[in-house]
């Protein structure tokens, strides 16, 4: 074993040190992101918004629209969207608070009915204060969304300066680095921009379609708050892997509380919403997205949990864009190629096997 390590084929000391330093740097960054959350979270959101609005910026720039007018149009759209979100949150919380006593009584009735079927004393349910659990949850969610809305001023300020310098960024790279390095930088940024811009654009379209279908279906079934669940389905669709599962789960749970003991409608609601998520998420969206960056689904889920732990709901929403950024960076740094292989999905393995088969033929 020691002999192998001393040969040229063994681990080189500088390579081990590089890996160690990388791990230390990553841990320092994680600590900084967690401690200085109030600073880094608006910065991260502004970067993701920058990728989202950049196609609009380039589209209007083709028609020789003045840059100040492009920025004005983009910010008008963003402010309008933010106002709609704030109005929706206020409406949703108000409606939920009004209906909360009904749902509390209905939930108590369901639990008593289930316990009585198993001949268990249900008198203990009378002492349970469900509102004591639900009100803090709604208040916490409301405060988090209001806090996010209030931080939009900082986000928009950062985005403004980002857009004002975006047209000279390539020239800065050419001046700062030599030609091969600057070209590689620009290529990596183009890849990140294309991947994230295309992902977010198509995600908005399919999420809107999902929300519309959810609203129509729940209205026909007679479920309460169809608009609330439609908008939440739209938002949850941006959370990779588990977002659609969470959307269906919350819709079905509230449907069960509302329609119990009529379980047929609950079953119809479950089948309808599951079918929408499967058809759009597994058939329509992959066809629209086409060829995407090859990322391991398992590691994508790990990144999802990591960003969710780090920054909550905002972390869940930005997990995929930042995973793409990490993947493109490790793809373009030679001594990080090993990490790129582990971050890749099944496509990279087929490429490796294809190359090895060609080598055998040669």
Curated annotation (Swiss-Prot):
Keyword Iron: no
Lineage summary: Bacteria, Pseudomonadati, Spirochaetota, Spirochaetia, Spirochaetales
Protein name (record): Putative transport protein BB_0006
Alphabetical list of InterPro entries matching this protein: AI-2E-like
Highest taxon listed in the record's lineage: Bacteria
Keywords on record: Cell membrane, Membrane, Transmembrane, Transmembrane helix, Transport
Compartments where found: Cell membrane
Family: Belongs to the autoinducer-2 exporter (AI-2E) (TC 2.A.86) family.
């Amino acid at each position: 074993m020691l002999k192998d390590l001393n040969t040229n084929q063994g681990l080189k000391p500088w390579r081990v040190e590089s890996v160690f330093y990388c791990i230390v740097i990553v841990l320092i960054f994680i600590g900084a992101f967690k401690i200085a959350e109030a600073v880094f979270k608006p910065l991260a959101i502004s970067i993701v918004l920058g990728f989202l609005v950049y196609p609009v910026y380039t589209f209007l720039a083709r028609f020789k629209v003045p840059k100040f007018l492009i920025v004005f149009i983009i910010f008008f759209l963003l402010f309008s969207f933010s106002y709609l979100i704030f109005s929706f949150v206020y409406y949703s919380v108000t409606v939920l608070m009004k209906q909360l006593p009904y749902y509390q009584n209905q939930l108590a009735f369901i639990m008593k009915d289930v316990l009585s079927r198993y001949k268990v004393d249900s008198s203990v349910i009378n002492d349970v204060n469900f509102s004591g659990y639900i009100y803090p949850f709604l208040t916490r969610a409301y405060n988090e969304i209001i806090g996010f809305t209030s931080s939009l001023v900082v986000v928009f300020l950062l985005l403004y300066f980002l857009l004002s310098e975006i047209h000279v960024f390539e020239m800065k790279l050419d001046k700062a680095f030599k030609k091969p390095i600057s070209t590689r930088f620009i290529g990596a940024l183009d890849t990140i921009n294309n991947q994230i811009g295309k992902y977010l654009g198509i995600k908005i379209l399919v999420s809107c379609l999902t929300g519309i279908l959810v609203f129509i279906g729940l209205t026909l079934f007679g479920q309460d708050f169809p608009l609330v669940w439609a908008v939440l389905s739209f938002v949850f669709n941006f959370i990779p892997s588990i977002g659609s599962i969470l959307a269906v789960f919350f819709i079905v749970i509230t449907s069960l509380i509302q329609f119990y003991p009529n379980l047929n409608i609950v079953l119809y609601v479950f089948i309808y919403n599951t079918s929408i998520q499967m058809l759009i998420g597994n058939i329509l969206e992959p066809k629209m997205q086409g060829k995407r960056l090859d990322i391991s689904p398992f590691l994508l889920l790990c990144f999802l949990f990591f960003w969710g732990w780090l920054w909550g709901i905002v972390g869940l929403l930005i997990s995929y864009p930042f995973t793409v950024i990490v993947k493109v960076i490790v793809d373009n740094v030679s001594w990080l190629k090993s990490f790129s292989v582990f971050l890749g999905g099944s496509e990279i393995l087929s490429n490796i096997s294809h190359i090895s088969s060609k080598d055998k033929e040669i």
